[in-house]
């Protein structure tokens, strides 16, 4: 781990962190790594991020950049395309259980639903939701303030400010809170 990771609290059953081509994952402050999360290569994340059980983040073939308060939920996979598509994720983003996010750009305040797929070159603008099970095809541009659903994903409606606060922001904040339960366990309840 790089020097920026000093003081990173992980359990005795440490997450799998692997350097690739001389690059190792780098973490901001107050980050949670589940015991069996896997992060490899050129991955840089901001503060208050969480990587949950069986999450896989592979910055091996290209780089991955995550902002603050990104939660990568159980079984989700983040990856890139060799020499073509890195992965950029903004702030306050929730990647739902078993979602696949591949070589795309996700702006701030976004919820990627459970089992959704977002493919290479797609751009998901801020304050948007990708519904559970949706497939955002390669190169798709998801409009800001919208909900996309289906296979292939299409816009189904505009999002309300209440839904942004009630779902997107709430879930991002909740995952910071949930991670505190595990950090207390790791430090003996302190």
Where are these regions (language model features)?
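Glycine-rich hexapeptide-repeat left-handed beta-helix
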Residues: 11-26, 60-68, 74-77, 81, ...
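N-terminal segments that cap or nucleate solenoid repeat domains
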Residues: 15-51
